[in-house]
């Protein structure tokens, strides 16, 4: 399904929504109804999540079309959310839902930028989009922000979710966390930074001299709103995590053995601020 979603322009809605249906079903149905079954299949689920992160990231790294690159990388992000759900911990599930929300914002921003480039150029082939930062500074800056958020750079909502996923999964299977973290970091950095270099930098070809940057409030406003939300939820993750953790606490089995547990500190809300004062994870 992920490979099909990554290929066609008609799957933009599916990229942002459809992949989350299965993960939402795991949280709402599989964990509450079959908690012991989830525990029995814990190793297999974590292995599948790790394979998704590494394989889809590797495939994204080999893409020569911006739409394909974004599509495959979005499937890899869902692997990180899957890892948080498979950890069967409140921290991990909260991080997984945060990743899903951040991915929805990032997918809208990324494919919106890709669609604008296609409207201007008629193609999203990366080798035909060199030097665009000179002609399209606004779109270029938004694309850099989208790529950095996709890499999991601190300050964006994706980082807040991914770090909670890694904390939640660490006590269960630390080697999976190490492999997943390094794999997502290295592979994601390679394809995102390579896309920034090939699309925005380098010489501007004669064919791209007539390209126009985004003009007018109606064109810029959607991109600005998505960028602001990604940064807002990255700097203040408690806007999401407090509500998510309070709801997820009713779904996670109370008898999770060997998974990360939350230790509330004083009267502060559970999770949220990524600091020892707000959350303590027992390793």
Predicted segments, located by residue:
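Alpha-helical transmembrane segments of polytopic integral membrane proteins
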Residues: 23-27, 54-57, 111-114, 163, ...
């Amino acid at each position: 399904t992920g490979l099909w979603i990554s290929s066609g322009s008609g799957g933009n809605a599916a990229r942002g929504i459809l992949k989350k249906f299965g993960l939402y079903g795991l949280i709402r149905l599989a964990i509450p109804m079959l908690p012991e079954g989830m525990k029995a299949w814990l190793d297999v689920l974590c292995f599948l999540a790790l394979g998704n992160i590494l394989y889809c990231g590797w495939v994204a790294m080999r893409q020569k079309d911006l739409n394909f690159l974004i599509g495959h990388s979005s499937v890899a992000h869902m692997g990180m959310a899957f890892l948080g759900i498979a950890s069967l911990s409140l921290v991990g599930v909260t991080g997984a839902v945060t990743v899903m929300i951040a991915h929805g914002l990032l997918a809208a921003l990324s494919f919106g930028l890709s669609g604008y480039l296609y409207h201007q150029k008629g193609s999203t082939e990366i080798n035909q989009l060199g030097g665009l930062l000179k002609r399209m500074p606004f779109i270029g800056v938004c694309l850099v922000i989208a790529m950095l958020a996709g890499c999991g750079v601190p300050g964006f909502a994706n980082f807040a979710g991914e770090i909670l996923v890694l904390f939640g999964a660490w006590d269960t299977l630390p080697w999976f966390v190490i492999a997943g973290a390094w794999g997502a970091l290295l592979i994601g950095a390679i394809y995102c930074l390579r896309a920034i270099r090939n699309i925005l930098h380098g010489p501007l070809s004669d064919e791209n001299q007539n390209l126009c940057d985004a003009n007018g409030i109606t064109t810029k406003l959607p991109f600005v709103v998505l960028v602001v939300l990604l940064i807002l939820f990255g700097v203040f993750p408690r806007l999401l995590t407090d509500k998510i953790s309070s709801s997820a606490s009713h779904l996670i089995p109370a008898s999770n053995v060997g998974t990360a547990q939350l230790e509330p500190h004083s009267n502060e809300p559970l999770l949220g601020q990524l600091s020892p004062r707000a959350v303590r994870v027992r390793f």
